[in-house]
Design a protein with these regions (language model features):
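Serine-hydrolase catalytic core recognition
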Residues: 1-175
Length: 175
C-alpha cells in the first residue's frame, strides 16, 4: 500500500516512476494500491473536509478497507502486505502500524508520531490546528487521538524510518 503525502493531495491514475518505486514494485510482481483516502483532493469538498477532526480515523479506515478488498479479490496475499509513504503518507503508515499488525513490513518517511509536538516545531503548524479544530491547549484530546505515539507500544511491524536532517516540515526528531 503506497500512501501519498498531503493529506490534501492525490495519487494520479497513471503508471509513473517515483522515488517510492511504484513502477519498480509492479515489475517485480507486486500489486500496488495507491488509495485516495478521505481528505484527498479531486473528489469534491465534502470528501476533502470529511477528514477535519477525524485524522487517524476515517482515512485509516479507508486504507484498510482498500487492503481488505485487494485480499478478498485475490490481488494481494494477506501474508505479504507492506505499507509505506512519505510525509502524510509516513504519518498514516505510523497510524496504521499502531492500529493493526496485518502488514509484514512498513516504510515511514518523514512521518509524524506526535501531533502536539508537530504543531510546536514545524514550519507550517496551521494544518495541525485545522485538522484538530483547535490549539494544543484547547484540543489536547483531539491531538492525542491523532497521534500514533500514544499507541506505539502496539507496533510490532518491522519498520524502516526515513528522515531528512534539514526537513523543516517534519524534523528528524518527529519521525
Amino acid at each position: 500500500v503506497d500512501l501519498h503525502g498531503g493529506p490534501t493531495s492525490a495519487r494520479q491514475a497513471e503508471l509513473q516512476f517515483s522515488m517510492y518505486g511504484r513502477g519498480l514494485l509492479s515489475t517485480q510482481g507486486w500489486a500496488v494500491l495507491s488509495p485516495n483516502y478521505r481528505g484527498s483532493t479531486g473528489y469534491g469538498d465534502k470528501f476533502l473536509t470529511d477528514l477535519i477532526g477525524r485524522e487517524n480515523d476515517i482515512e485509516v479506515q479507508d486504507i484498510l478497507a482498500g487492503a481488505d478488498a485487494m485480499i478478498e479479490r485475490g490481488i494481494a496475499d494477506k501474508d505479504k502486505l507492506a505499507v509505506g509513504g512519505w510525509s502524510n503518507g509516513g504519518y498514516l503508515t505510523n497510524c496504521i502500524i499502531a492500529t493493526t499488525d496485518i502488514f509484514k513490513a512498513a516504510s515511514s518517511g518523514a512521518g509524524v508520531f506526535d501531533q502536539t509536538m508537530q504543531w510546536a516545531i514545524e514550519d507550517t503548524p496551521g494544518h495541525v490546528v485545522n485538522y484538530a479544530q483547535g490549539l494544543p491547549w484547547t484540543a489536547a484530546d483531539e491531538l492525542q487521538d491523532m497521534s500514533p505515539i500514544y499507541e506505539a507500544d502496539n507496533i510490532t511491524t518491522p519498520t524502516i524510518i526515513h528522515v531528512g536532517a534539514g526537513d523543516a516540515r517534519v524534523p528528524a526528531e518527529q519521525s
